[in-house]
Amino acid sequence: MYLSSGWEQSIYVLLMLDQLPEGKYINSIFLSERLGVSDSYLKKIIKLLDNEGLVKSVRGKNGGIALSRPLSQISFYDVFVAIEGKNRIFESQNLLKRFLGEEEGKKAKRCVVTNSLDMIENTLVSNLTSITLSQVAFQAEMNYDLTDIRDWINHHQK
């Protein structure tokens, strides 16, 4: 399975935005510099997050981006959908009829390969949905010294 680099970048952007004080914003260029990623690509990612209601953006001198809801209300699946889209991971090509032969294929009710892949996809969606970014933020809080990122956010907020 492949997740784009935008998915990981999105997770870190959201974790960084969680460090902002209420009512404050940060410019995306600071985020791209901090993460060492392309600003133009990160702006596209932020637009996707904005479209899904995960962040809010404000234009102008004191503009920037901020979370639009708490991390406890954002799951890995929400980010996945924002960045990767709502398309299914697997779409059947209906190869069962060719595999069995046309006549036998007519008797088959459901493809066992499709059933298995649907179960895998459902498990993935369930797991992604069950993990919130607040859980990840809590783990980061317990395992890392976040002083530097907090100081950095305070210096760059608007």
Identify the meaning behind each predicted range:
Residues 26-36:
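A short alpha-helical element within helix-turn-helix/winged-helix DNA-binding domains
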Residues 40:
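Key DNA-contact positions within bacterial/archaeal DNA-binding proteins
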Residues 52-53:
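Glycine-centered, phosphate/nucleic-acid-interacting loop/turn motifs that mediate DNA/RNA or nucleotide
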Residues 61-68:
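Minor-groove-contacting beta-hairpin "wing" of winged helix-turn-helix DNA-binding domains
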Residues 71-97:
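Conserved segment of winged-helix/HTH DNA-binding domains
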Residues 92-158:
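C-terminal regulatory/oligomerization modules of transcriptional regulators
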